[in-house]
């Protein structure tokens, strides 16, 4: 499946999670891999046309290969799911990572994706190069006041009675909290996204189970570059949540954005600040990839083990033995999509392009054996 915006194409794929749930994910852009951990409301195709999200997708795709996915029960992922526990959601992220063929990558955790990304980074420190948290938190109940808990209960009641109604009055409450500074067009889009992304029953179940997700105990374990961004006037997730992250993760840097919007919009002053911080934060990964590609291009027959990941080498060895992509996938227990992605990554690192890329990569492998 494909969709397009501003001349950019996204490739929509599916990964099977540990419990069999199919998780939809999309890939677009070029550069080092950046995994966007799913937030509360998403729909890969609907978001692609969004007046609220479009600037994020376009700009991040200029500097990274962006991988994003719909949470279980939401968007293009399997619906009617009842298990929305932290453990299940971490398994979903693991499934996407494996199916996409990612070895080492940066993570951008947005909103409710925070606990999942933090847990994943703690479990797999060898795979996450850096972690950015935007409008997020470690645990939903961190420093929650009695008033906030009462408000949360009221929101759950609103979902039950108004989410699936054809008119948006009830959903508009959530829209105002997300983008109080949005235009009417942007607010209508968020109104529609709520019904498009998830039904009322799943929204309630997922919301209740999400409250139990808490990765606070993992924060002292993290040892990687961490950037924390949050709007000062955010009414969905309080700024104090990000302060908690920054004060409990060693070396984390906190950037306070001058905005009241949970999702910083393209026309407000906070947007170029947010974008600059993210691009600068990702720059070391871009530099590392550029060095790897330059080294491969400069060397006639480079030591492939220093350029390619172990999995990319495995795939290339089987290709050299005459296996097609189906056979490679069967041998390594990978989807054909994942095999293709490993090969494309190898070609890029070796500076090979076009129809002769496979033959060129195989020739370089055989030259060192």
Positions of the model-derived regions?
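Conserved acidic catalytic loop of the alpha/beta-hydrolase fold
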Residues: 87-105
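Helix-rich cap/lid subdomain of alpha/beta-hydrolase
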Residues: 134-192, 200-207
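Conserved hydrolase catalytic core segment
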Residues: 103-146
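Basic, Lys/Arg-enriched C-terminal extension of HTH/homeodomain DNA-binding domains
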Residues: 348-369
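Regulatory hinge/linker segments at domain boundaries
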Residues: 288-317
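Catalytic active-site module of serine/aspartate enzymes centered on a nucleophile-bearing elbow/loop
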Residues: 252-298
């Amino acid at each position: 499946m494909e969709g397009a915006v501003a001349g950019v194409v996204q490739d929509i794929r599916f990964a099977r999670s540990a419990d069999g749930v199919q998780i939809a994910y999309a890939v677009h852009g070029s550069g080092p891999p950046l995994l966007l951990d799913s937030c509360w409301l998403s729909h890969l195709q609907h978001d692609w046309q969004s007046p609220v999200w479009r600037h994020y997708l376009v700009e991040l795709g200029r500097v990274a290969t962006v991988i994003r996915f719909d949470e279980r029960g939401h968007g293009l992922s399997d619906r009617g799911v009842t298990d929305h526990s932290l453990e299940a959601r971490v398994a979903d992220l693991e499934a996407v990572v494996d199916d996409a063929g990612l070895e080492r990558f940066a993570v951008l955790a947005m909103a409710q994706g925070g606990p999942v990304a933090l847990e994943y980074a703690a479990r797999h420190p060898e795979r996450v190069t850096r972690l950015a948290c935007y409008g997020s938190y470690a645990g939903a109940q961190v420093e929650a006041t009695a008033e906030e808990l009462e408000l949360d209960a009221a929101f759950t009641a609103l979902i039950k009675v108004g989410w699936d109604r054809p008119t948006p009055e009830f959903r508009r409450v959530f829209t105002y909290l997300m983008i109080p500074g949005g235009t009417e067009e942007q607010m209508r889009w968020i109104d529609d996204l709520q019904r498009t992304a998830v039904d009322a029953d799943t929204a309630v179940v997922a919301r209740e189970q999400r409250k139990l997700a808490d990765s606070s105990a993992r924060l002292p374990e993290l040892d990687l570059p961490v950037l924390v961004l949050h709007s000062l006037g955010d009414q969905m997730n309080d700024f104090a949540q990000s302060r908690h992250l920054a004060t409990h993760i060693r070396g984390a840097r906190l950037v306070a954005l001058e905005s009241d919007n949970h999702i910083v919009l393209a026309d407000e002053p906070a947007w170029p600040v947010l974008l600059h911080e993210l691009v600068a934060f990702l720059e070391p990964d871009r530099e590392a990839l550029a060095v790897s590609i330059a080294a491969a291009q400069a060397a006639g027959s480079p030591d492939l083990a220093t350029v390619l990941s172990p999995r990319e080498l495995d795939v290339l060895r089987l290709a050299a033995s005459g296996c097609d992509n189906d056979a490679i996938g069967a041998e390594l227990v990978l989807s054909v999509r994942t095999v293709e992605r490993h090969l494309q990554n190898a070609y890029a690192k070796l500076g090979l392009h076009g129809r002769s890329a496979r033959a060129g990569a195989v020739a370089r492998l055989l030259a060192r054996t």
